[in-house]
């Protein structure tokens, strides 16, 4: 029985792209984001023509809006169920498997995070500091709903933008620490940009024929 790979890291670091490469090489891919999109009806109904990711963002809204903490908790409960199901299926899979987690996997229960670490090979694709600066500037230009794990707190008369500018680097640093806690292996995200299947399999120490 194969020990499933578990890819963790910030959104946009390349987890999904690398998972798809493995999928074309015989691996069974468990895409947590896609699974969540298929179960969004429990949280929000997309408008006609609206992509699930935008419907989720519209529903969750920004961290300074009323009720955000409650909506975040509801979302994470859904992510918990989906991620646990993916892990169970990956463990039972005859074919080798890879679980493409969301960026907020580190906010799931300690029990599930420990189980991911125990039963899977957790690989953290690290976002370098230069990319974090770019992510911060992009987020400030076009803020999108993300899970903050209780970190977002405005001080005094801070505007939402001022609080976000102050706290976003802390969000990234906190996540970096939490990813490292569960990771068995850390790979610099840019290291695998543009990589093809043989090189990816070799870098991960995987058999070129997963059967």
Model-derived features with residue positions:
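P-loop (Walker A) phosphate-binding loop of NTP-binding proteins
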Residues: 10-13, 22
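Walker A/P-loop
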Residues: 16
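Conserved catalytic segments around the Walker B and adjacent sensor/switch elements
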Residues: 27-32
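NTP-dependent small-molecule kinase module
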Residues: 2, 21, 25, 96, ...
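Short glycine-rich anion-binding loops that position phosphate/pyrophosphate groups of nucleotides
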Residues: 103-106, 128-130, 192
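A glycine- and Lys/Arg-enriched "phosphate-lid" helix/loop adjacent to the NTP-binding pocket
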Residues: 118-176
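Hydrophobic anchor at the beta1->P-loop junction of P-loop NTPases
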Residues: 7
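ATP-dependent small-molecule kinase phosphotransfer cores
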Residues: 34-114
